[in-house]
Amino acid sequence: MSKRIALFPALLLALLVIVATALTWMNFSQALPRSQWAQAAWSPDIDVIEQMIFHYSLLPRLAISLLVGAGLGLVGVLFQQVLRNPLAEPTTLGVATGAQLGITVTTLWAIPGAMASQFAAQAGACVVGLIVFGVAWGKRLSPVTLILAGLVVSLYCGAINQLLVIFHHDQLQSMFLWSTGTLTQTDWGGVERLWPQLLGGVMLTLLLLRPLTLMGLDDGVARNLGLALSLARLAALSLAIVISALLVNAVGIIGFIGLFAPLLAKMLGARRLLPRLMLASLIGALILWLSDQIILWLTRVWMEVSTGSVTALIGAPLLLWLLPRLRSISAPDMKVNDRVAAERQHVLAFALAGGVLLLMAVVVALSFGRDAHGWTWASGALLEDLMPWRWPRIMAALFAGVMLAVAGCIIQRLTGNPMASPEVLGISSGAAFGVVLMLFLVPGNAFGWLLPAGSLGAAVTLLIIMIAAGRGGFSPHRMLLAGMALSTAFTMLLMMLQASGDPRMAQVLTWISGSTYNATDAQVWRTGIVMVILLAITPLCRRWLTILPLGGDTARAVGMALTPTRIALLLLAACLTATATMTIGPLSFVGLMAPHIARMMGFRRTMPHIVISALVGGLLLVFADWCGRMVLFPFQIPAGLLSTFIGAPYFIYLLRKQSR
């Protein structure tokens, strides 16, 4: 059986090599007659423009694709090995978003010189790394704390970047293409800088081979074998962060390879660390090589697209196809080294207090605000005039926050993975892509089609996840990997459409950022009715949600039918997410963070966890919507972005408090 499992991806890999080689041959032949290849490679004739392009653009581009792909495969294995999480990749600790934020700032301030942008990218990545290490240091750099801190800091940097894009859309137009990766070269300078740096990274990785191998074991076992765990994690993650920042400097952000290459290496039978490092690097180089040659061909026959988009569009279907053949994979226990507050008693009192606090927040959001004359508390006739404008927005934020928080709670309990959230399942991205696609297909004002288009996108995404994960018995991690594959592909497609410069994308940019701007009374009533129905179903699932975090074997032992249970919970979470996304757009924070905040406050039993998560999610988004309307009055900041600014520091504080 294992030979059959290994044979299939091996044949697939061989097919990809053949296709990449054929495409390279065809692209090179179109650019220059084969009889001139040797001369153009070694000493191009400066009077023949085709030879100059071949020597200074095509060949360096091929070399950089192989180098960057290999580097992404290498750091993907490093992150997955150190964090012991199959979903970890170079963007997990926020390295890519930190580097992107640095580049955005230099672009916005028009700081000249290539070295300035490279330094900014390195500085952004290193600052993010230091923040993440600082938060997790007190817990001996435990994998779960590192993952959560990295995700939150990554979301925070991404929110700042998106905010700058909203207010400086035209100035940062060039950033969209870079954000999805571009391998365009004009000389050999990039290759000459990158290959010695990567070689140094490989040598340091080999020096860390034994500690890295031990880090794949349980923490207690690794310590008993004499490993200084915190120091080893710090060294390995620092190395991975530096290599990732170098790759971002070279070509921008190219996602998915760091996730996909290590998984395919495992499928090919590379169980030991050294073969896995080598094989993942080869697979990464192959995928990026193939993607770039497809781009060169598309540029000639259609239009230029970004490298990261094609990489995701190649990798996502491949991963979905290979998922049923993926052996069982595991994630770190969410409770390892966990020193959360003691389980809270008197849950009803806390829930009532939270409900009162939420009601007060709604009243303040309705009545207190700014106008042309300053701060005012609206009442009487003025409040009646403001109600049609403020009421739908506040209710939309409240309902969406509650639904995303409950969906996040269900998904994290269903999968037992601390990285799980509605956004990771790809349903939000699928809904957003459906809306954007409809915007391009329907002439005139397409916003009337927002709900059906988004619902269809979410439904198709869910269907693909269920088909891909269903053949593997609905393993939680297969669901997450399928969701991540689709989410990455949809996100890259959205960024590619943004980079196209089409004016229609500016219309939907605010909605994508999580704005309540277009909320209407009718939409809020529909959302409220659906929310009440879905929340009424949730308590019926409490036994499942209590038992599933204990593991599949325990669930079977008490007579639970695992596959139908997982399908039902996945459907419930998907409906909650899709409804919230249709109301205010795809958010990137509440569904991930609200369940963790509730758990760290001491609510770990199923129903208290769900109730407090819902209250936290609703409060967070109501407050975020009010701040978004008032902070830069008369300008507005989308609630989805501002919820990150409000929630992330508090979440980091809770993580830090745990580690003391």
UniProtKB/Swiss-Prot annotation:
SUPFAM superfamilies registered for this protein in UniProt: ABC transporter involved in vitamin B12 uptake, BtuC (SSF81345)
Reported impact of M175L: No effect on ATPase activity, but 50% decrease in Fe-ferrichrome transport efficiency of the FhuCB complex compared to wild-type
Natural source organism: Escherichia coli (strain K12)
Keywords on record: Cell inner membrane, Cell membrane, Ion transport, Iron, Iron transport, Membrane, Transmembrane, Transmembrane helix, Transport
Role summary: Part of the ABC transporter complex FhuCDB involved in iron(3+)-hydroxamate import. Responsible for the translocation of the substrate across the membrane.
Native organism taxonomy: Bacteria, Pseudomonadati, Pseudomonadota, Gammaproteobacteria, Enterobacterales
Main location: membrane
Name the record gives this protein: Iron(3+)-hydroxamate import system permease protein FhuB
Domain notes: FhuD interacts with a periplasmic and a transmembrane/cytoplasmic region of FhuB. The transmembrane region may be part of a pore through which a portion of FhuD inserts into the cytoplasmic membrane during transport.
GO cellular component: ATP-binding cassette (ABC) transporter complex; ATP-binding cassette (ABC) transporter complex, substrate-binding subunit-containing; plasma membrane
Short name of any one Pfam family annotated for the protein: FecCD
UniProt GO MF annotations: siderophore uptake transmembrane transporter activity; transmembrane transporter activity
Family: Belongs to the binding-protein-dependent transport system permease family. FecCD subfamily.
Protein's membrane topology: Multi-pass membrane protein
InterPro entries in the record: ABC_BtuC-like, ABC_transptr_permease_BtuC
Documented effect of changing Q507A: Decreased binding to ferrichrome-FhuD
Gene: fhuB
